[in-house]
Protein backbone atom coordinates (compact mmCIF):
# COMPACT_ATOMS: atom_id res chain seq x y z
CA UNK A 1 0.00 0.00 0.00
CA UNK A 2 1.35 3.40 -0.96
CA UNK A 3 0.66 6.29 1.42
CA UNK A 4 -0.64 8.79 0.75
CA UNK A 5 -2.48 7.69 -2.40
CA UNK A 6 -2.55 11.31 -3.65
CA UNK A 7 0.08 13.96 -3.13
CA UNK A 8 -0.61 16.44 -0.34
CA UNK A 9 0.08 20.17 -0.70
CA UNK A 10 0.34 20.38 3.11
CA UNK A 11 3.32 18.00 3.04
CA UNK A 12 5.23 19.89 0.29
CA UNK A 13 7.78 21.61 2.56
CA UNK A 14 8.28 18.32 4.40
CA UNK A 15 8.96 16.53 1.09
CA UNK A 16 11.32 19.28 -0.08
CA UNK A 17 13.41 18.97 3.10
CA UNK A 18 13.67 15.17 2.96
CA UNK A 19 13.86 14.24 -0.71
CA UNK A 20 16.91 15.13 -2.78
CA UNK A 21 15.96 16.85 -6.06
CA UNK A 22 12.29 16.88 -5.09
CA UNK A 23 10.02 18.33 -7.77
CA UNK A 24 6.69 19.81 -6.67
CA UNK A 25 3.72 19.24 -8.95
CA UNK A 26 3.30 21.95 -11.57
CA UNK A 27 -0.48 22.24 -11.25
CA UNK A 28 -2.27 22.78 -7.93
CA UNK A 29 -5.18 20.69 -9.23
CA UNK A 30 -2.91 17.63 -9.18
CA UNK A 31 -2.86 17.68 -5.36
CA UNK A 32 -5.60 16.14 -3.29
CA UNK A 33 -8.05 18.58 -1.73
CA UNK A 34 -6.97 19.38 1.83
CA UNK A 35 -8.78 17.23 4.37
CA UNK A 36 -8.87 17.09 8.15
CA UNK A 37 -10.41 14.48 10.44
CA UNK A 38 -11.47 14.98 14.02
CA UNK A 39 -11.82 11.84 16.13
CA UNK A 40 -14.07 12.79 19.03
CA UNK A 41 -14.05 11.26 22.49
CA UNK A 42 -17.26 11.00 24.49
CA UNK A 43 -20.06 13.21 23.20
CA UNK A 44 -17.68 15.89 21.89
CA UNK A 45 -18.76 15.44 18.25
CA UNK A 46 -22.15 16.99 19.04
CA UNK A 47 -20.73 19.87 21.11
CA UNK A 48 -21.72 23.27 19.62
CA UNK A 49 -18.12 24.54 19.67
CA UNK A 50 -16.88 21.43 17.85
CA UNK A 51 -19.58 22.06 15.25
CA UNK A 52 -18.36 25.67 14.97
CA UNK A 53 -14.78 24.42 14.51
CA UNK A 54 -15.93 22.10 11.71
CA UNK A 55 -17.77 24.98 10.01
CA UNK A 56 -14.64 27.16 10.26
CA UNK A 57 -12.45 24.45 8.72
CA UNK A 58 -14.94 24.05 5.88
CA UNK A 59 -14.87 27.82 5.28
CA UNK A 60 -11.07 27.52 5.09
CA UNK A 61 -11.51 25.01 2.27
CA UNK A 62 -10.93 21.74 4.12
CA UNK A 63 -12.94 18.60 3.62
CA UNK A 64 -13.84 17.77 7.24
CA UNK A 65 -14.56 14.34 8.66
CA UNK A 66 -16.05 14.16 12.17
CA UNK A 67 -15.72 10.65 13.59
CA UNK A 68 -16.88 9.51 17.04
CA UNK A 69 -14.31 7.45 18.91
CA UNK A 70 -16.82 4.59 19.03
CA UNK A 71 -16.53 4.35 15.22
CA UNK A 72 -12.73 4.74 15.09
CA UNK A 73 -11.94 2.20 17.82
CA UNK A 74 -11.62 1.77 21.55
CA UNK A 75 -7.85 1.20 21.69
CA UNK A 76 -4.85 3.05 20.29
CA UNK A 77 -4.08 0.15 17.94
CA UNK A 78 -7.66 -0.05 16.64
CA UNK A 79 -7.69 3.71 15.97
CA UNK A 80 -4.36 3.42 14.14
CA UNK A 81 -5.77 0.54 12.08
CA UNK A 82 -8.85 2.68 11.33
CA UNK A 83 -6.56 5.48 10.09
CA UNK A 84 -4.57 3.04 7.92
CA UNK A 85 -7.80 1.81 6.33
CA UNK A 86 -9.19 5.27 5.58
CA UNK A 87 -5.96 6.20 3.82
CA UNK A 88 -6.90 3.58 1.24
CA UNK A 89 -10.70 3.74 1.37
CA UNK A 90 -11.34 7.52 1.28
CA UNK A 91 -11.11 9.42 -2.01
CA UNK A 92 -9.58 12.33 -0.09
CA UNK A 93 -7.96 10.92 3.05
CA UNK A 94 -7.18 13.33 5.87
CA UNK A 95 -3.78 14.98 5.94
CA UNK A 96 -4.42 16.20 9.48
CA UNK A 97 -6.03 14.21 12.29
CA UNK A 98 -7.15 16.00 15.44
CA UNK A 99 -8.04 13.97 18.51
CA UNK A 100 -10.66 15.74 20.65
CA UNK A 101 -10.38 14.38 24.18
CA UNK A 102 -7.87 13.77 26.93
CA UNK A 103 -6.02 10.51 27.56
CA UNK A 104 -8.52 9.66 30.34
CA UNK A 105 -11.91 10.83 31.58
CA UNK A 106 -15.32 11.14 29.95
CA UNK A 107 -13.91 12.55 26.68
CA UNK A 108 -10.96 10.17 26.47
CA UNK A 109 -9.19 9.04 23.33
CA UNK A 110 -6.66 6.21 23.79
CA UNK A 111 -2.95 6.96 23.47
CA UNK A 112 0.27 5.07 22.89
CA UNK A 113 2.96 4.93 25.57
CA UNK A 114 6.59 5.83 25.03
CA UNK A 115 8.81 5.35 28.05
CA UNK A 116 6.62 6.42 30.94
CA UNK A 117 4.56 8.98 29.03
CA UNK A 118 1.61 9.20 26.66
CA UNK A 119 2.22 9.91 22.98
CA UNK A 120 0.11 10.28 19.84
CA UNK A 121 2.94 10.37 17.30
CA UNK A 122 2.51 6.62 16.67
CA UNK A 123 -0.85 7.40 15.04
CA UNK A 124 1.00 9.28 12.28
CA UNK A 125 3.18 6.30 11.23
CA UNK A 126 0.74 4.50 8.96
CA UNK A 127 2.99 2.79 6.43
CA UNK A 128 6.34 1.02 6.58
CA UNK A 129 8.79 0.65 9.43
CA UNK A 130 10.17 4.18 9.30
CA UNK A 131 9.69 7.28 11.38
CA UNK A 132 8.20 9.35 8.58
CA UNK A 133 4.61 10.42 9.23
CA UNK A 134 1.85 9.94 6.68
CA UNK A 135 -0.44 12.40 8.50
CA UNK A 136 -0.10 15.33 10.86
CA UNK A 137 -1.53 14.44 14.29
CA UNK A 138 -2.66 16.68 17.13
CA UNK A 139 -4.82 16.57 20.22
CA UNK A 140 -7.28 19.02 21.71
CA UNK A 141 -6.92 17.73 25.26
CA UNK A 142 -10.24 18.28 27.04
CA UNK A 143 -11.97 16.70 30.05
CA UNK A 144 -15.28 18.56 30.07
CA UNK A 145 -17.77 20.47 27.98
CA UNK A 146 -16.40 23.75 29.36
CA UNK A 147 -12.86 22.69 28.35
CA UNK A 148 -14.09 22.16 24.79
CA UNK A 149 -15.79 25.56 24.77
CA UNK A 150 -12.67 27.30 26.11
CA UNK A 151 -10.07 25.62 23.88
CA UNK A 152 -12.07 25.76 20.66
CA UNK A 153 -13.09 29.37 21.34
CA UNK A 154 -9.42 30.32 21.88
CA UNK A 155 -8.43 28.52 18.67
CA UNK A 156 -11.13 30.21 16.61
CA UNK A 157 -10.45 33.63 18.13
CA UNK A 158 -6.75 33.27 17.30
CA UNK A 159 -7.29 32.00 13.76
CA UNK A 160 -9.96 34.57 12.92
CA UNK A 161 -7.94 37.52 14.22
CA UNK A 162 -8.73 39.55 11.12
CA UNK A 163 -8.23 42.81 13.02
CA UNK A 164 -4.51 42.06 13.27
CA UNK A 165 -1.96 42.76 10.58
CA UNK A 166 -0.22 40.00 8.62
CA UNK A 167 2.41 39.75 11.35
CA UNK A 168 -0.24 37.99 13.47
CA UNK A 169 -0.08 34.99 11.14
CA UNK A 170 3.68 35.04 10.53
CA UNK A 171 5.07 34.94 14.07
CA UNK A 172 4.79 32.36 16.83
CA UNK A 173 6.02 31.61 20.29
CA UNK A 174 6.14 27.96 21.32
CA UNK A 175 6.73 26.35 24.68
CA UNK A 176 8.53 23.02 24.95
CA UNK A 177 9.10 20.55 27.73
CA UNK A 178 12.40 18.66 27.93
CA UNK A 179 11.99 14.93 27.47
CA UNK A 180 13.65 14.18 30.81
CA UNK A 181 10.88 15.98 32.72
CA UNK A 182 8.59 12.95 32.58
Task: Identify what each model region corresponds to.
Residues 1-182:
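Cysteine-dependent hydrolase recognition
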Amino acid sequence: IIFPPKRSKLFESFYEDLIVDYEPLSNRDEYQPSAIMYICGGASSSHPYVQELVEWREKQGYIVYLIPESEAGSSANSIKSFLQNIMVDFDNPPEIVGLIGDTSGSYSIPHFTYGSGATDVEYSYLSGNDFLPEIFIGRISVNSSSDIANLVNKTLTYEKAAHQGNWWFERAALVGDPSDSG
